[in-house]
Amino acid sequence: MRFTGEEWALSPTAFSTYVKCPLKFYFDVVERLRSDDELDESVDNMTFGNIFHEAADLLYKQTNGYADPSARLTELREKGEVEKCVDKAIAKTYFGYKDGVLRQELGGELIIIRNIVREYLGQNLLNYDIKNDDFTEVATERKIGMIVPIRVGEESFDIHLAGRSDRIDTLKNGQLRVIDYKTGKPRLNYAGIESLFHGEPIATTRESNIINTLLYSMIISHNEGKDVCPELYYVGSMVRKDYSPRFVETIDRQSRTLDSYADVAPEFEDEVKETLREMFNRSIPFRQCEDDSACKYCDYQTICNRK
């Protein structure tokens, strides 16, 4: 059975795809279909994101265990480690050189990508963490997972939910912090946990990045037995003086900043289990999403036959 063993886990990304559109989940995750257009159009964004994540991992591994790491981050930047890590990331993720050594001069779009990654990492991200340095970095790119037991009718399933967290910190107040790096436009607001799973229009309510980060928080909270603070680092926007990486929940015009996963854990985990029960219910087909707001840029329109 898929997603019930160590070799084939259900990732947070796959889970949030199902929340938005079960049929897209079927095409994308179960059948593993990929259109040529999807691959062509996404290569630049994927390349940029992969290079940034690899460079951040290489750089922040050098801060592991440093409390209040502003001095360490400043030292690394002054020693040129940002540039070195970006070049190593390009060598590893783009050219496939496992030793991280560039063997040729860069040209065209790769030069542009390198310059932007250097700016996002060496200025936006480092400046933010230097200013807000009340943390100790625990791990980068850590594989995490947990078993979620569910029952569907007479059948029982142990769902293996697993992924790779970009960064885990310990905060001075004793919390763990899970950070997900993003290179797109900030989307940190949501209208309550229920809206993340059932809200419409789908494209603007079922925020995949928030769902994914809450799933990482759920896994870490269960595994470590500690409270977790979920945060999204939209690195392109961290240069703003008023930038905050924390989620803002707004219900009935009342807003609150989500400082603790525990504040939403019961409701969120109920929704996760209910979604998994639906996913594994043999009598429920992989259907099209309820409205077409999420269909505009979907690469499966030609085979979906939505009317």
What are these model-derived regions, one by one?
Residues 1-62, 280, 291-292, 300-305:
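C-terminal, charged and often intrinsically disordered regions of DNA end-processing helicases
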Residues 15-23, 40-51, 78-82, 86, ...:
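Secondary-structure capping and boundary motifs in well-ordered enzyme cores
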Residues 21-34, 90, 94, 175-194, ...:
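Active-site-adjacent bridging/hinge elements
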Residues 22, 30, 34, 55-67, ...:
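A generic secondary-structure signal for well-formed alpha-helical elements
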Residues 33-36, 146-150, 177, 185-189, ...:
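Flexible loop/turn segments at secondary-structure boundaries
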Residues 54-143, 147-148, 249:
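A non-catalytic, helix-rich entry segment at domain boundaries
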Residues 135-223:
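Non-catalytic protein-protein interaction segments used by genome-maintenance enzymes to assemble
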Residues 205-210, 215-307:
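Metal-dependent nuclease catalytic regions and adjoining charged, substrate-binding loops involved
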